[in-house]
Each structure stands twice: as C-alpha cells, then as structure tokens.
C-alpha cells in the first residue's frame, strides 16, 4: 500500500498481477478511477483496504510495520518502560485529537459502492480485530448501525462513539470525505465541526457481540 501512482508499477510490470492502492488516496475518487483504468488496461487487479484505523500519513507507519516482523509486542513493552509508544495513533488520540479519525482513510460501508466500480478487491483488516464478524457483516451488507471506530483496525477505544447514522446524515461528511486538501490539511474547521455532530456518548444502539454472532450466521449460511 505504498504505490502512489502508475510510476511505481511500471518498472516491475512482470513481477505482479495485483496490488493495493495507497491508503492516503483511497477517498480520492478521481485518482482511484485513473488507477483503476490503468490497472484494467495492463491486466492488473487493483485492491484497496476499507477499514484501516491508521492515521493519514502516519509518520510511524513504516516503523510500526517493521516491528510486525521483529517481535512487535515485546518491543512495545520495552518501549513502555521508557515512556515511548510505537503506536503513534494512540498517543495522538490520547491527546484529544479525535477529529483526525474523521480525516483518516477508512471507508464507510454505505459509501463502498462509490469505490467498488474502480477496484476489484476490497480488503478488510480482521486478523487481530476484536469483532471480525461485525466488520464482515457491515461491509457485506453496505450498512452499519453503530460506532464506526469499532470497524477499524487498529481500533482505538475513544471515550465516545463515532455515530455512523449521524455521519451519513451530515451535510459536512461528503465535503470531509472528498476533501481535496486531505493530505495537506488547511485546518479549515470542517472536521472539527463534523466531530461536534457525530461524536456522541456510547449507547445501547451499538451492536453487541450477540448481534455479531447472528450476523455471522446470516452472512455465511443465508
């Protein structure tokens, strides 16, 4: 997911048949359309990840990914002894920068059809997720009633919920989702205003584990 355009693909055309688009450009439909057209013209399969909980342009991403192959959990514990966390997203959210979740790269289940016409594979991160069936059900049915943060991986335990229904009903969401300055934020105030609309106390309406188990049965057995 470090391919930012066709230039990165051209030197290795004979080495791959599928690839994933850069997370940082996931919400840019015009860019995704161009990459999808190029992929089809060259016989390649284009994919994207829909539920990444990573910060947009996270400066710790490469470091964090490297730790996956080098005893990440052990090194994390060592780091904690020195007051250092390898999870910069956690540190960032601990500081109260909750609007950064809205300007990240995840895709709402209801918005997925906007992107599916350009990609052939939609990846869902569930390997270490606490509620994998809930994630599968949400994206398979293009519908989710609850806290959007529960769908992402990593999933930070925010003090309140990102109400998906409120997000879908907000006139600000399309502007934030398709913001042309997403990778060079001007801090215009839209994300902060949107946070005020959708960041709500956790409630009884959020899906339970029992709901997730039922959804799993419906999804796989009909």
Spans of features found by a protein language model:
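Active-site pocket-lining/capping segments in soluble small-molecule metabolic enzymes
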Residues: 1-8, 15-222
